[in-house]
Amino acid sequence: MTMFASLTSKMLSVSTSDHASVVSLNLFVALLCACIVIGHLLEENRWMNESITALLIGLGTGVVILLISRGKNSHLLVFSEDLFFIYLLPPIIFNAGFQVKKKQFFRNFVTIMAFGAIGTVVSCTIISLGAIQFFKKLDIGTFDLGDFLAIGAIFAATDSVCTLQVLNQDETPLLYSLVFGEGVVNDATSVVLFNAIQSFDLTHLNHEAAFQFLGNFFYLFLLSTGLGVATGLISAYVIKKLYFGRHSTDREVALMMLMAYLSYMLAELFALSGILTVFFCGIVMSHYTWHNVTESSRITTKHAFATLSFLAETFIFLYVGMDALDIEKWRFVSDSPGTSVAVSSILMGLVMLGRAAFVFPLSFLSNLAKKHQSEKISIKQQVVIWWAGLMRGAVSMALAYNKFTRSGHTELRGNAIMITSTITVCLFSTMVFGMLTKPLIRYLMPHQKATTSTTSMLSDDSTPKSIHIPLLDGEQLDSFELPGSHQDVPRPNSLRGFLMRPTRTVHYYWRQFDDAFMRPVFGGRGFVPFVPGSPTERSSHDLSKP
């Protein structure tokens, strides 16, 4: 009888727990719907955008739950870095690579890598040195060198979503490409830096250890990129050879989604950078795999990946907003609010300083290497790039939770101060800087119609957005050139030609290699699956008529 009563009580507790989870999920889905509807209604608002809308709805919901629970709880779900890195981040980064306008991205690849990789290291260094200088005077806890370096990596991670939602990539292709590309590379670099700092022995620092650290850093970068490219090529080869669309387009779509996610999980399995891997997997898939599937599969995958990315971004901002009022973490700093405000202010100042320390110098160096005025970064564009990287978001939150909590909970005062300061910086930068983004960009970058050649180069109504343009310039390079450039791409037959036109030289040899070796094996642009009853068959039949 006692055993039966014990079993019954356990079943009731499980049932109650399941019911609470169902209620939480239902409310969260309803909040997501509200974010989409309200964000759409406020789309033309001067100050608001979808990210800020989701954040405010999350904060408001947290306040309501806090009042209902009488100060005991403020969120439906506890922020988990595992949930963020495993389920929410992959679709966002993959879609970024899948939809990227590759011509602009690779045209500015060196500048993007300089901003995203070198700039992140510079920003991390300045934030770490500033934290060492100021935090020891505030007596917030005992932090070692590894902790300070981790703080630098945490706050070097930017979140440029608010700026990208305002910029128009057809009107300002150069600026959009730089902000977008830097954001992806910055996230990857920050995570790689953070993981390297966590796993590296910092007790014995010398020149050999420093070179080993740099070697590991570049090793992760190159291997992660290679894994993403390899996974994308495998998916292209399999779909090209097996003609899944002959039997079912569902299999094509399913395989593309699973291969994309597999690339990220393989990177995590081998302790590489999943962000870089899935990003380059997306680029390769859009260049080869996407062209190997049927027309219906192309439309489906384009919208499916974009929808998953949009939902994940909205979920993250809603999630962060609700978790910002977590009572457990704020209780530790309730006795010294001045210290918490001081830490947050110092971090925000260091973020702004670290950002300026590389954006303007690297832009100056980039302009020295550019020949045409249209390719140079103007001072107004530099200000927008600097501003776009001031906001901090879910990556910083996830890294902070990983470093300063255990299973989402913290027991040390210093760790609690760092968590609450991270939340404060993320909320302040996203809401204040995010609300000022639209007016700032409208002031600095008045709406100007792109030139005819640029617009035609970057968009095509007959094909899905951003996927029309082939990798590293395709066959259309000759007919779509920026004003002031040569109409065709001559064969670079000398070292002087490479030094004078390095970008075009790389494009030329890439096109030769792609056409001769890659496309015959992996398909891509020009490969059209012949599926009975499909639009492909009908168009082919129409073309065959006299």
From Swiss-Prot:
<feature type="transmembrane region" description="Helical">
    <location>
        <begin position="265"/>
        <end position="285"/>
    </location>
</feature>
<dbReference type="InterPro" id="IPR006153">
    <property type="entry name" value="Cation/H_exchanger_TM"/>
</dbReference>
<dbReference type="InterPro" id="IPR004709">
    <property type="entry name" value="NaH_exchanger"/>
</dbReference>
<dbReference type="GO" id="GO:0005829">
    <property type="term" value="C:cytosol"/>
</dbReference>
<dbReference type="Pfam" id="PF00999">
    <property type="entry name" value="Na_H_Exchanger"/>
</dbReference>
<feature type="glycosylation site" description="N-linked (GlcNAc...) asparagine">
    <location>
        <position position="292"/>
    </location>
</feature>
<keyword id="KW-0739">Sodium transport</keyword>
<keyword id="KW-1133">Transmembrane helix</keyword>
<keyword id="KW-0915">Sodium</keyword>
<dbReference type="GO" id="GO:1990573">
    <property type="term" value="P:potassium ion import across plasma membrane"/>
</dbReference>
<feature type="transmembrane region" description="Helical">
    <location>
        <begin position="219"/>
        <end position="239"/>
    </location>
</feature>
<feature type="transmembrane region" description="Helical">
    <location>
        <begin position="345"/>
        <end position="365"/>
    </location>
</feature>
<feature type="intramembrane region" description="Helical">
    <location>
        <begin position="149"/>
        <end position="168"/>
    </location>
</feature>
<feature type="transmembrane region" description="Helical">
    <location>
        <begin position="48"/>
        <end position="68"/>
    </location>
</feature>
<keyword id="KW-0050">Antiport</keyword>
<feature type="transmembrane region" description="Helical">
    <location>
        <begin position="22"/>
        <end position="42"/>
    </location>
</feature>
<feature type="transmembrane region" description="Helical">
    <location>
        <begin position="382"/>
        <end position="402"/>
    </location>
</feature>
<dbReference type="GO" id="GO:0006885">
    <property type="term" value="P:regulation of pH"/>
</dbReference>
<dbReference type="GO" id="GO:0090333">
    <property type="term" value="P:regulation of stomatal closure"/>
</dbReference>
<feature type="topological domain" description="Cytoplasmic">
    <location>
        <begin position="97"/>
        <end position="111"/>
    </location>
</feature>
<feature type="topological domain" description="Vacuolar">
    <location>
        <begin position="43"/>
        <end position="47"/>
    </location>
</feature>
<keyword id="KW-0812">Transmembrane</keyword>
<feature type="transmembrane region" description="Helical">
    <location>
        <begin position="416"/>
        <end position="436"/>
    </location>
</feature>
<feature type="topological domain" description="Cytoplasmic">
    <location>
        <begin position="240"/>
        <end position="264"/>
    </location>
</feature>
<feature type="topological domain" description="Vacuolar">
    <location>
        <begin position="195"/>
        <end position="218"/>
    </location>
</feature>
<feature type="intramembrane region" description="Helical">
    <location>
        <begin position="76"/>
        <end position="96"/>
    </location>
</feature>
<keyword id="KW-0926">Vacuole</keyword>
<comment type="function">
    <text>Acts in low affinity electroneutral exchange of protons for cations such as Na(+) or K(+) across membranes. May also exchange Li(+) and Cs(+) with a lower affinity. Involved in vacuolar ion compartmentalization necessary for cell volume regulation and cytoplasmic Na(+) detoxification.</text>
</comment>
<feature type="intramembrane region" description="Helical">
    <location>
        <begin position="174"/>
        <end position="194"/>
    </location>
</feature>
<feature type="topological domain" description="Cytoplasmic">
    <location>
        <begin position="403"/>
        <end position="415"/>
    </location>
</feature>
<feature type="topological domain" description="Cytoplasmic">
    <location>
        <begin position="326"/>
        <end position="344"/>
    </location>
</feature>
<protein>
    <recommendedName>
        <fullName>Sodium/hydrogen exchanger 2</fullName>
    </recommendedName>
</protein>
<dbReference type="InterPro" id="IPR018422">
    <property type="entry name" value="Cation/H_exchanger_CPA1"/>
</dbReference>
<feature type="topological domain" description="Cytoplasmic">
    <location>
        <begin position="69"/>
        <end position="75"/>
    </location>
</feature>
<keyword id="KW-0325">Glycoprotein</keyword>
<keyword id="KW-0472">Membrane</keyword>
<keyword id="KW-0630">Potassium</keyword>
<dbReference type="GO" id="GO:0005774">
    <property type="term" value="C:vacuolar membrane"/>
</dbReference>
<dbReference type="GO" id="GO:0055075">
    <property type="term" value="P:potassium ion homeostasis"/>
</dbReference>
<comment type="similarity">
    <text>Belongs to the monovalent cation:proton antiporter 1 (CPA1) transporter (TC 2.A.36) family.</text>
</comment>
<keyword id="KW-0813">Transport</keyword>
<feature type="topological domain" description="Vacuolar">
    <location>
        <begin position="366"/>
        <end position="381"/>
    </location>
</feature>
